[in-house]
Amino acid sequence: GDINIESNSSLNSFSLPNYKKGEFTIGNNSSLTSVALPSYYSGLPTSTTYAQTITNNPLLTTIVLTSFNLGNITIKNNNLLATFNLPSFNNGSILLFSNTNLVNTSFPNFTDGVFELRDCNSIQQVNFPNLTTGRLQILYNSSLNSVTFPNLTNLKFGDNIGFYNNNLSSSMVNSILNKMLTVLPASGKNIRLDGQKPVAPPTGQGIIDKQTLISNGNNVQTD
């Protein structure tokens, strides 16, 4: 079944240890500090628009979704949330927006889907050790200096990949450009690495890799 927990100013914690499947919306709960759905394993099919949401809970520090493996989830405007892990998540979409104290994330089994990270200004790194097919949009995170996706082989949903307006170094920009040489499609990719603060143009081999990508019919923007 579906769950809607909204605008409950006296709710401090929410736990459903046996809840396994459905949509949930948890938002605008001014005293909520923890959400625990440890048995929840699947949202609706991944074609559904972001059915699982946890938004605008200003005191929330803990989210437990140990078994969640398939679906679409949005975590937004939870300003005390420092850690968000999905240890079982495999396929779907993860959107993390404006969680200003978020510093740690972990998605060790995420292999196929969409990931967006925006305006999370405390996080310094995000890693996707097993992502093979995906769309990454990682934008406007002022402390972010490292993004890794060693097993990515294919882009999806428009062939766009963006890492702009972060804090990536020239070395990290070089690394991403080199990786994109082998990510399919070979041509038609739109790659954005511009707007780093401070500016971080490609250097050395990175300049060569950028030109190779452009010569192969890709659009590449850097500082």
Where are these predicted regions, by residue range?
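Canonical leucine-rich repeat
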Residues: 14, 35, 63, 83-84, ...
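Short, well-ordered coil↔helix boundary/capping segments
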Residues: 167-171, 204
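Concave beta-strand-loop units of leucine-rich repeat
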Residues: 1-10, 18-31, 41-59, 69-70, ...
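Extracellular/surface-exposed low-complexity segments
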Residues: 200-223
